[in-house]
Amino acid sequence: EVGIPSQAKEAIAFAILASCTLDNEPGNVPSVTGASARAVLGSITPAPLQRAAAPRNALVPSAVPADRSSLLTEQRLPESMSLDSMPLNEALDLMSSQDQQAVAAVRSQHAEIATLIEIVADRLHRGGRLFYCGAGTSGRLGVLDAAECSPTFRTDPQMVQAIIAGGEGAVFAAIEGAEDDTQAGAAAIEIRNIGPSDVLIGIAAGGTTPFVIGALAAARNQKAATALICCVKPTASEPPVDVVIRPLTGPEVLTGSTRLKAGTATKLILNTISTLAMVRLGKVHENLMVDLRATNQKLWDRGARLVALLTGLQRESALELLRSADGSVKIAVLMQRGRLTSQEAQAALAKSGGALRVALELNAEKR
């Protein structure tokens, strides 16, 4: 630092942060800039979430907002018109009965969901990536599902990712106006180099979110496979995609609050897509998550129990075997049942495309 002007040091620091951001690697250089927050989606040093509220007129739209009153998700539910004065037990029964409609709505979309699962599994098998994209509740649901794939299925963190309008901070608090930025949605696709080998699933309960529409259009331009999950009937503004999953959950108990039935249906759909796509990638044996990543005590325990279940070993011996297999349930099972070394088990698993069932069958044929 000796002899370097402060302006030059500041310029260098901001160049580093900008580079990290463009590479989609949030960074922070507190020793140089004094920043306490990481760089997020183009913001060099984003403001802390505890900042004072913006002036009231800052949130007033510059243009007349589109009239969304015709959307199914914006309608009033007759059964909940007296929600504010309804006895608690009655309100509980009402919400529970309405939640059942979310399940039924998902069931009505099984054909479309199956089509999308096949597309996702094919692209992932060929080395592509799956992206969820949404704003608000829809974006957070994508984050939830993407975050669970690595520990559950031992996937590379890059394989399944989530894009949320407003960036990382929007996971924890509303970022006003972020969902209205179509260009930001398109930029999110460009910065991640999404292309023909990838899949983008847009999530928008009302089907009109500009950020999601911009992202889908950009992904489609790059020849990526695209899909939309929405809870309304077709509209003129609906973007063209390869697959539309349309669970019509109907009006919400709390009018317009799509974190309720629409959110429930969306979570069920994302659960189904990721789980069954991973089954097709050989990451499940029987109904067991044999590709789990043992990152904590709970998962080491579960892994040991899986090894014991599939080999007949006692828990202590299974845990020792799992450790020798570097935490891989598949390798541990192949070592025990196939009488293989760790290296031989890895080779057998690679030959079978990662499917434990196939690897066990091939090894049995050799003996």
Model-based region annotation:
Residues 6, 76, 251-257, 282-297:
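Conserved Rossmann-fold dehydrogenase catalytic segment
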Residues 108-125:
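A short, well-structured juxtamembrane/interface segment
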Residues 131-269, 274-281:
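Glycine-rich phosphate-binding loops that contact phosphosugars or nucleotide phosphates
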Residues 272, 277-367:
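Short, amphipathic alpha-helical interaction segments embedded in low-complexity terminal/linker regions
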Residues 73-74, 94-102, 162-173, 285, ...:
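Gly-rich Lys/Arg/Thr-decorated short loops/hinges at beta-loop-alpha junctions or inter-strand turns
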Residues 2-50:
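Glycine-rich phosphate-binding/hydrolytic loop that grips phosphoryl groups
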Residues 31-59, 294-298, 363-366:
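A short, charged, Gly/Pro-tolerant segment at domain boundaries
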Residues 59-105, 109:
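Cofactor-/ligand-binding subdomain signature composed of acidic, glycine-rich
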